[in-house]
């Protein structure tokens, strides 16, 4: 068996370092009488969503952020849910919040998300904030950034991986990752050249062979094959799928073939790569919002 050549982009260790930095920043805010607060709106009792929300509040406790939970019944009306959104918009203790998705089918997700205060949008996916990202190519961003794209860029930066002038292939065009990450990567402070591939891309292997960096976010298990990668590429495995392990148990798997570790120079594990960074960036958005409100950001 040959030894893997890829170095690991360790999201767990990097996220832990970021949380330590955030703890210090929260202490500075506390000295001014300000305690950042993360709000969550959870509709129903889906086990996966409940687990995700619980993890976010556990992260809050680690860094000193106040938890504000709004756990609501599955059959809540859209108007009653909007009332909870308005309540968090007006709550001074809540500096940022999320609506856990997906929502039940009887609720219009777009209506709910657009009702959020953009300045309290901890996920960074409000249309206003995405629009600000489109419009601001070079200046300082003073609005929340999408957590997973921000986490990807930060993971690369903290491993001293240069992106300037590099050819970055993003696979997947979802609103959460694929579409906004191109906006971050093409800001002048990063200056990458971005190609966005998707299910309509005619020859994905040809694109992969030219890419210095691959960000796989399609949600298709092991679609990125080792033989298609450029030797020495940097590969971030962001996609999440659940597949049967052969024993009737669902296990989490990514978009990248494990054999990519024999070709890539750097590889993010999945799980344990971008996921912890996404959670850390959620906390960072909440703290940054509190800092802006305090006039120290």
UniProtKB/Swiss-Prot annotation:
Transmembrane segments: none annotated. The keyword Cell membrane does not apply. GO terms for biological process: L-histidine biosynthetic process; methionine biosynthetic process; purine nucleotide biosynthetic process; tetrahydrofolate interconversion. It catalyses: (6R)-5,10-methylene-5,6,7,8-tetrahydrofolate + NADP(+) = (6R)-5,10-methenyltetrahydrofolate + NADPH; (6R)-5,10-methenyltetrahydrofolate + H2O = (6R)-10-formyltetrahydrofolate + H(+). NCBIfam families: PRK14193.1 (NF010789). PANTHER family: C-1-TETRAHYDROFOLATE SYNTHASE, CYTOPLASMIC, C-1-TETRAHYDROFOLATE SYNTHASE, CYTOPLASMIC-RELATED. Catalyzes the oxidation of 5,10-methylenetetrahydrofolate to 5,10-methenyltetrahydrofolate and then the hydrolysis of 5,10-methenyltetrahydrofolate to 10-formyltetrahydrofolate. Coiled coil: none annotated. HAMAP family: THF_DHG_CYH (MF_01576). Homodimer. This is Bifunctional protein FolD 2. Keywords: Amino-acid biosynthesis, Histidine biosynthesis, Hydrolase, Methionine biosynthesis, Multifunctional enzyme, NADP, One-carbon metabolism, Oxidoreductase, Purine biosynthesis. Belongs to the tetrahydrofolate dehydrogenase/cyclohydrolase family. Its EC number is 1.5.1.5, 3.5.4.9. CDD domains: NAD_bind_m-THF_DH_Cyclohyd. It comes from Paenarthrobacter aurescens (strain TC1).
């Amino acid at each position: 068996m040959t030894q893997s050549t890829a170095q690991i982009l360790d999201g767990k260790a990097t996220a832990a370092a970021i949380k330590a930095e955030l703890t210090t920043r929260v202490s500075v805010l506390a000295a001014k009488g300000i305690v950042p607060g993360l709000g969550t709106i959870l509709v129903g009792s889906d086990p996966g969503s409940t687990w995700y929300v619980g993890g976010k509040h556990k992260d809050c406790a680690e860094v000193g952020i106040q938890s504000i939970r709004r756990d609501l019944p599955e059959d809540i009306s859209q108007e009653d849910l909007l009332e909870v959104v308005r309540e968090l918009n007006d709550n001074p203790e809540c500096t940022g919040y999320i609506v856990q998705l997906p929502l039940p089918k009887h609720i219009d997700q777009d209506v709910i998300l657009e009702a959020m205060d953009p300045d309290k949008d901890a996920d960074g996916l409000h249309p206003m904030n995405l629009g600000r990202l489109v419009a601001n190519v070079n200046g300082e961003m003073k609005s929340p950034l999408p957590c997973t794209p921000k986490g990807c860029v930060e993971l690369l930066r903290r491993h001293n991986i240069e992106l300037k002038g590099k050819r970055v292939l993003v696979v997947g065009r979802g609103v959460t990752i694929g579409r906004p990450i191109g906006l971050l990567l093409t800001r002048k402070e990063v200056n990458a050249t971005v190609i966005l591939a998707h299910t309509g891309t005619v020859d994905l292997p040809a694109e992969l062979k030219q890419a210095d960096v691959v960000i796989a976010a399609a949600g298709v298990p092991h679609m990125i094959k080792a033989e298609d990668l450029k030797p020495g590429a940097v590969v971030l495995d962001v996609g999440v799928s659940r597949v049967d392990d052969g024993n009737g148990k669902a296990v989490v798997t990514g978009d990248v073939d494990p054999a990519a570790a024999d070709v890539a120079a750097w590889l993010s594990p999945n799980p344990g790569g971008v996921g912890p960074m996404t959670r850390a960036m959620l906390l960072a958005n909440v703290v940054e919002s509190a800092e802006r409100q305090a006039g120290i950001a």
